[in-house]
From Swiss-Prot:
Source organism phylogeny: Bacteria, Pseudomonadati, Pseudomonadota, Gammaproteobacteria, Enterobacterales
Domain of life: Bacteria
Name of the featured protein: ATP synthase subunit delta
Pfam families, per database record: OSCP (PF00213)
Record note on quaternary structure: F-type ATPases have 2 components, F(1) - the catalytic core - and F(0) - the membrane proton channel. F(1) has five subunits: alpha(3), beta(3), gamma(1), delta(1), epsilon(1). F(0) has three main subunits: a(1), b(2) and c(10-14). The alpha and beta chains form an alternating ring which encloses part of the gamma chain. F(1) is attached to F(0) by a central stalk formed by the gamma and epsilon chains, while a peripheral stalk is formed by the delta and b chains.
SUPFAM superfamilies from the UniProt entry: N-terminal domain of the delta subunit of the F1F0-ATP synthase
UniProt-annotated location(s): Cell membrane
Cellular component, GO, one term: proton-transporting ATP synthase complex
Function, as annotated: F(1)F(0) ATP synthase produces ATP from ADP in the presence of a proton or sodium gradient. F-type ATPases consist of two structural domains, F(1) containing the extramembraneous catalytic core and F(0) containing the membrane proton channel, linked together by a central stalk and a peripheral stalk. During catalysis, ATP synthesis in the catalytic domain of F(1) is coupled via a rotary mechanism of the central stalk subunits to proton translocation.
Protein source organism: Buchnera aphidicola subsp. Acyrthosiphon pisum (strain APS) (Acyrthosiphon pisum symbiotic bacterium)
InterPro entries registered for this protein in UniProt: ATP_synth_OSCP/delta_N_sf, ATPase_OSCP/dsu
Membrane topology value: Peripheral membrane protein
One GO MF term attached to the UniProt entry: proton-transporting ATP synthase activity, rotational mechanism
Amino acid sequence: MSVADTIARPYAQAIFEIAIENNTIEKWKNILIFIKTIASHKKFKNFLSGSISPKYLSLIFITIGTNIIDENAKNLIKLLSENQRFNILNNIFERFVKLEACYKNIIIVQLKSAFSLKENLINKIRKVLERFFLKKTKIIYKVDPNILNGMIVKVNNTIFDLSAQNHLKQLSDSLNF
């Protein structure tokens, strides 16, 4: 786990607890997307270098997001600004999404294949994984021609590598002892 992930965890946890308490998970997801989008904009990055005061930086975010930002979001922005933590917004968002998935009893699966898979095959894979893990499954699918043939399935810290690239590596390793 990276340092940024470690720092982001308590922020994401606190935000998620507020979201659960107020039944505003989707709203908070949108707020986090909004804040991280602004913070990552190339013109805005100059402000994040520390050249302006945290109070003024907070005011800029709050002014831009008048329609979406409530009191709790204002407090988050002030806290991120005072602690110079806008650089970990992606980590906070990713952790928030993981907390949401856990709360809703969903696992997030990363699926890579060497070529494009048809939707019905992806659905079959989803059903197998749902039966295996006894949870709803959200698949994030990507095509990666570097794996030659087959697929790689990643669930949390577990990787099922069914790629030709992996089989060739295992064969090579066994021949080289």
